[in-house]
Amino acid sequence: AASDVYKRQEEVGHGACASAPEDVEELLSVDMGCVGEGLECTDRQVSICVKDGHGPYHYDVVKGLIQAAKDNHIDYAADVYPYYGSDADAALSAGIDARHGLIGPGVYASHGYERSHKDAVAATLELLKAYLA
């Protein structure tokens, strides 16, 4: 059975870590997609993170997300974020043994005056719907 966990804290090592069911099999973190130098994502796309500063995301999750985007003609970019960590990473660090992934709308200026485009938000929602179908 699927479970939803919603949290409002950001990258602080609790929330999803503390409230995920013991038998969780997959974690999909929905955050922001990075936009900037050396990255493929724009502020009009959904970003699928392949790897971040904690290591690679689960191959089958990333592959499934990319395939769902392709099959549904969703504008996406697959990127590596070398200086980033997600709530899914924090959950794995806390000992949760689950497949994990990270997606989000492309966003400029993280932790500043963040800017994105409604197309990126729509693409993120469409990817969520397609992947979870």
Residue spans for each PLM region:
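Glycine-rich, charged/polar anion/phosphate-binding loops
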Residues: 10-18, 85-89
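Short acidic, glycine/serine/threonine-rich loops at helix termini
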Residues: 15-18, 39-41, 114-115
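A short linear-motif detector with a strong N-terminal bias
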Residues: 7-9, 26-28, 80-84
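Short, small-residue-biased leader/transition segments that mark boundaries at the very start
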Residues: 2-6
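Active-site-adjacent substrate-binding region
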Residues: 47-133
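A glycine-rich helix N-cap at a beta->alpha junction
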Residues: 19-38, 102
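Active-site loop ensemble at the mouth of alpha/beta enzyme cores that anchors a bound cofactor
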Residues: 38-48
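Acidic, glycine-rich active-site loops and adjacent beta-strand->loop/helix elements
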Residues: 7-13, 33-34, 107-109
